[in-house]
Curated annotation (Swiss-Prot):
Chain's role: RNA-binding protein required for the maturation of the box H/ACA small nucleolar ribonucleoprotein (H/ACA snoRNP) complex and ribosome biogenesis. During assembly of the H/ACA snoRNP complex it associates with the complex and dissociates during complex maturation, becoming replaced by Gar1 to yield mature H/ACA snoRNP complex.
A single GO BP: pseudouridine synthesis
Compositionally biased region (Basic and acidic residues): 388-402
Biased composition (Low complexity): 146-157, 426-446
GO cellular component: nucleus; sno(s)RNA-containing ribonucleoprotein complex
Protein name according to UniProt: H/ACA ribonucleoprotein complex non-core subunit NAF1
Record-stated family: Belongs to the NAF1 family.
Subunit-structure text: During assembly of the complex, component of the box H/ACA small nucleolar ribonucleoprotein (H/ACA snoRNP) complex.
Keywords linked to the UniProt accession: Nucleus, Phosphoprotein, Ribosome biogenesis, RNA-binding, rRNA processing
Taxonomic superkingdom: Eukaryota
Length: 564
């Protein structure tokens, strides 16, 4: 009996836990009231059990049961007080967490409680309570807020009940669904989806059951859809959106999508139309060039045979051995060894009308004026550049950089020579340049050789010092052009008058001898053979030559009397 009664008390304790928060003063009083209630319940339960079991039993057992009941009541009172205090503390902590969540988010979910005690919430802890009565908590709106399951249910119900988007029968791409990213609706579990139609009459905007302004979003997306349609379907991408109609129509122009282009670039449709050529060439002048490889829109691509001649633009190609004209070469693609010649037409329909098919044999006439060859020298003069200039076009020639270091050096050297040439022509003459060059050559020739060391160097230096003196002595002794006479010989002296064949003796030892034994040339009189000069005498006048005729006007000296 004693072991079973506390278990019954413990089993009933958690059923009676309060669901509301109270102050510290109210906790004690309220706990006493609950303890009394629990004791009364236990007493009634135990008395009923004992009365049912112990009717034929003696009074002694009843006394013992009463003692046991008193002890169990004391134990249950203490345990219930402890449990009530613990449950109240837990409820206070839970209430604080709920208040924090209520401040952070506006959507607070309040679930209803089945018991009346859970609806009683204690007032503020700072308020003083005089009477042991429980004050109800402030009324909280318990209307169902937007939670995850409720939003999902609302989303599924909106599709069927609230609003329906009318389908558009214009086409598959007329309706688009764009998710709206609105910061006001970011707290919801999903983003509203708006259906937009490109047609003005059928353009309607709809959103899910959110409080955001769906009308403004629908109008904005409708305008955006129109702009997208205009951009896709227009031909000229550079024109503004205001230049087109409201529904994006462009008149008679084609609505096909055009490739991107830069400013100033012309597409195939922008080029002037091609006039059909009526040319025929003899069959013997035609040479097979290749075949029609493919047809792309309004271009015919011709592949050539290996090791064939290279042709330039505007070369006329033929079909059927010269009897039919294919067209002029519009562009050349591919490698130099295996080029592809492009022939342009006005439209693809024109190609079909002329009966041009893939695999047709193409001919050329290299001996006629309709063929343009590639000249390598002219091709090398064309300078291309990979650099991008304004509007993604190639830069002009004056802005092209050199692609090779050697070319850059050659160009700089040529510019340097040109500047030097211009400077020379403007300041100095050709004679001045020649004189400067001659002076530089002489200076380089007069420059002494490198000096040597040792005894050999001393001998060479002595010889070099003696050579200039000898040369200077020879230059200072001028010689007669006709005779190699002594410099002191004077042909206008009286000796020449009386002695025309007189020659002064070689008494001057300063005169250098030309030939050993022959100081003077052979005289033109007497013997024709050379002979030695007569010895010198110590008188002033030498004797006359032995076989010479007497001098004129000097007969008195010969023993004859003077004329009377």
């Amino acid at each position: 009996m004693e072991s079973e009664q506390p278990a019954a008390v413990k089993a009933s304790a958690p059923i009676e836990e309060p669901q509301s928060t109270e102050t510290a003063v109210e906790l004690g009083k309220h706990s006493t009231l609950k303890a009394d209630l629990s004791i009364d319940k236990l007493e009634t339960a135990t008395t009923e059990a004992t009365n049912a079991v112990v009717e034929p039993v003696e009074m002694e057992q009843q006394v013992e049961n009463e003692l046991v009941n008193e002890s169990t009541q004391a134990m249950t009172s203490t345990t219930t007080q402890e449990k009530v205090v613990g449950s109240v503390n837990n409820l206070v902590e839970e209430q604080q967490c709920v208040e924090m969540e209520f401040e952070t988010s506006s959507d607070l979910v309040v679930q209803g409680s089945p018991s009346e005690e859970s609806k009683k919430v204690a007032s503020d802890a700072s308020a003083t309570v005089t009477a042991p009565q429980v004050q109800p908590a402030p009324h909280v709106d318990s209307s169902p807020q937007a939670s995850g399951l409720s939003l999902l249910a609302a989303y599924s119900s909106d599709d069927s009940d609230d609003e329906k988007v009318t389908p558009v029968q214009n086409g598959d791409n007329d309706v688009i669904e764009v998710p709206v990213t609105d910061p006001a609706s970011s707290t919801t579990a999903y983003r509203p989806v708006v259906a937009v139609s490109s047609d003005d009459e059928s353009s309607k905007s709809s959103s899910s059951s959110s409080d955001s302004d769906s009308d403004s979003e629908g109008e904005y997306l409708t305008v955006l859809r129109k702009k997208i349609d205009k951009r896709i379907n227009t031909v000229d991408c550079d024109e503004d959106d205001e230049d087109f109609d409201e529904d994006g129509a462009t008149g008679d122009r084609s609505r096909r999508r055009q490739p991107p282009k830069v400013r100033g670039e012309m597409l195939l449709d922008d080029l002037p139309p091609i006039h059909q050529l009526e040319i025929t060439v003899p069959e013997d002048e035609c040479v097979e060039l290749g075949k029609v490889q493919s047809i792309v829109d309004q271009l015919v691509l011709v592949s050539v045979l290996p090791n064939s001649m290279l042709f330039d633009l505007d070369t006329v190609l033929f079909l059927e051995k010269g009897r039919k004209v294919l067209g002029e070469v519009f562009d050349v693609l591919g490698q130099v060894s295996d080029p592809l010649y492009c022939v342009r037409f006005n439209s693809n329909k024109q190609i079909l009308d002329r009966g041009i098919k893939i695999g047709d044999v193409v001919y050329c006439a290299p001996k006629t004026e309709h063929t343009q060859f590639v000249i390598l020298s002219k091709l090398m003069q064309v300078r291309g550049s990979d650099a991008s200039w304004e509007h993604d076009v190639e830069p002009p020639a004056r802005y092209v950089d050199h692609s090779d270091d050697e070319e850059e050096r050659e160009a700089r050297a040529e510019q340097r020579k040109r500047r030097q040439r211009d400077r020379t022509n403007s300041t100095d003459s050709v004679d001045t340049v020649t004189s400067v060059a001659t002076t530089a050559t002489k200076a380089s020739s007069v420059a002494p050789p490198p000096r040597q060391r040792g005894r050999r160097g001393q001998r060479e230096s002595f010889r070099q010092s003696q050579r200039p003196s000898i040369n200077q002595h020879n230059q200072n002794q001028p010689q007669d052009e006709q005779y190699n006479f002594h410099p002191s010989y004077n042909p206008g002296s009286w000796h020449s008058n009386y002695y025309q064949n007189y020659h002064q003796a070689a008494a001057n030892f300063n005169m250098a001898q030309q030939h050993p034994g022959m100081p003077f040339p052979v005289p033109n009189y007497g013997y024709g053979m050379p002979y030695a000069m007569p010895p010198m005498y110590p008188h002033m006048y030498p004797p006359p030559p032995p076989f010479a005729p007497p001098p004129p006007n000097n007969q008195s000296h010969q023993g004859q009397p003077p004329p009377s």
